């Protein structure tokens, strides 16, 4: 079944993860993936030359909250069977970013023209995967309701370095009432494969965020007077780290534009 638009600006509907990936591969969908195929886990991408892969793997092990590994490809491989059938790492994400020397060099709809045989792909857990659990728990998510990407911010919290990889932790933010924030901690603490429990609640200044209305990535999301900002470690962290490290080459997903896998969110607590 192919994609069709949702009502009132809602996310499009796909039959399953394979259907979504095929629509993305064919260029029929290029938007952010929050709320798409909600039963399935989504992943952030970090694609590096083989020479840098070992240091990055160690970086992920030392920083499991922002960089929980769901899968790692063989050098040059565009398939990753552990995460999905009929999955192509070079075409099945709605948007890619290419960084050279720490600077954004290109934004591409696919990587077919730049793929190399020495590239290794890391797929990292994404907070979009726990959003279905939050919604099932009765916790409203404003960015989903508004059809926006989640708001993401650089913080003053430094990651643990490994080789050339170092830099600030990036967080995603969801506004919630206090009672919902408590439930959100309980729900997401059971899902360490997709960032786990929040790293901070409340005053954003305590983690170096000056203005919630001006996210570094994603879209601003309004906060009501009776709500708290709740912050989770975010898989955009590797992009900030790559920029800080001025790596010769790395390729990532565009923020909010994830790889939709065949993994089910309900199975993530057991990975």
Curated annotation (Swiss-Prot):
Pfam families documented for this protein: D-Glu_cyclase (PF07286)
Keywords: Lyase
GO molecular function, one term: lyase activity
Disulfide-linked positions: none
Documented EC number(s): 4.2.1.-
Enzyme class label: lyase
Family designation: Belongs to the D-glutamate cyclase family.
Protein name, as recorded: Putative hydro-lyase Mrad2831_3350
């Amino acid at each position: 079944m192919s994609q069709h638009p949702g009502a009132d600006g809602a996310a499009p509907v796909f039959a399953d993860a394979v259907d979504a990936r095929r629509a993305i591969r064919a260029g029929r969908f290029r938007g952010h993936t929050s709320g798409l195929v909600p039963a399935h886990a989504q992943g952030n991408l970090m694609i590096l030359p083989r020479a840098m892969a070992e240091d990055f793997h160690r970086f992920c092990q030392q920083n499991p909250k922002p960089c929980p590994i769901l899968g790692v490809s063989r050098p040059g491989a565009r398939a990753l069977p552990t995460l999905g059938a009929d999955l192509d790492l070079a075409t099945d994400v709605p948007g890619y970013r290419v960084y050279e020397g720490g600077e954004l060099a290109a934004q591409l709809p696919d990587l077919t023209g730049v793929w190399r045989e020495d590239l290794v792909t890391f797929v990292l857990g994404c907070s979009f995967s726990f959003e279905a659990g939050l919604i099932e728990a009765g916790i409203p998510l404003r960015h989903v309701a508004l059809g926006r990407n989640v708001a993401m911010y650089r913080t003053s919290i430094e990651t643990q370095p490994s080789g050339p990889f170092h830099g600030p932790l990036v967080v995603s933010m969801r506004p919630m009432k206090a009672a919902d924030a408590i439930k959100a901690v309980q729900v997401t603490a059971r899902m360490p494969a997709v960032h786990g429990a929040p790293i901070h609640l409340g005053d954003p200044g305590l983690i170096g965020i000056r203005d919630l209305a001006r996210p570094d990535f994603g879209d601003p999301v309004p906060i009501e007077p009776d709500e708290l900002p709740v912050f989770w470690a975010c898989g955009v962290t590797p992009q900030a780290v790559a920029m800080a490290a001025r790596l010769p080459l790395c390729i990532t997903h565009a923020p909010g534009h994830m790889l939709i896998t065949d993994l089910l969110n309900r199975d993530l607590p057991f990975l």
